[in-house]
Amino acid sequence: MRIPPSAQSSILAAFLTLTPLFGQSGKATVDNGTWLFIDTTDIPASRQHLNHEALFSKYVEGYNRQVLKAIDIVQAHAMDGGGYFTGMHAKPTESPIGYKLTLFGKPLLDPPRTTSYCSGSSYGVFIEALNLLLPEGSSRLSEERYESLRMQEPDGSRREDRIKFWGKWNDDGWGTHYAMVQYSGIGEEIPPERARPGDFMNIAWVKGLGHSVVFLGWFVKKNQPGMVFWSSQKSTNGYGDLVLWPLTSVKSVKTVRMTHPERIFSFDVLREVVRELPGDTVAPPNR
């Protein structure tokens, strides 16, 4: 169901109070360098739920736990998914995310619609994770970096792809890599075998363009690998979990882990990025 705007703040406040915050030790998530396959019983039957932290945090420590909690925060705004829509020339134009997203209390977007699309939803999780990790960040965020993170121009018009932080995240190709690794240094590239719940991922399809998601895990079914992730897509009516099995539709991926959230206060807003990068083939070992 859709949560009325008047009730969202009280529901989210209660959710944040009642749900314990894991991984407060202030460290990046680490892994052992090998494939991790989650238990298929941890994959919920419901596409929309608020159990990402509860279900998947047992597989990780550190910052990825806050990312998982951030998924629940975004999802709580629209338990029916909120709707999926793309159309930059539509009137009103597309909305990256369907609610008034803020960073440290500073508005990033006045949404023209209540719908969302993939890169907007993953960016929302990134921002909400920063709110959890750096609760006193408002006084440390410079105006030029705040402006770079905004999802609209000052006049409310659409911020174009490749422009500043959000424009790089929203770019075709490996947007999370452009924004988190190259542009800001907030993240680190991770090969597929090291991917863990709470990592950010761009997927290139065999047919079609790509998808920006928050990775939840690899799994094996009938001796074939699959993956589960959270994003906004048409098949889930916006925000929701998607189970992909088998992986025959995936051409390649690019995975990024949040490792230095504090660099949100120091990145160079004029830094350029390299867009032409090869993707990583997903080839788990036979099990």
Walk through the language-model features, giving the residues of each.
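Bacterial N-terminal signal peptides that target proteins for export
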Residues: 1-11
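Low-complexity, Gly/Ser/Thr/Pro-rich intrinsically disordered linker/tail segments
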Residues: 225-287
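A generic secondary-structure boundary signal that marks alpha-helix termini
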Residues: 20, 127-131, 207
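Bacterial Sec-dependent signal peptides at the C-terminal "C-region" and cleavage site
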Residues: 18-27
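Intrinsically disordered, low-complexity regions enriched in polar/acidic and amide residues
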Residues: 7, 23, 179-181
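...with weaker cross-activation on analogous glycine-rich loops/strands in unrelated enzymes
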Residues: 143-237
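N-terminal capping segments
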Residues: 26-170
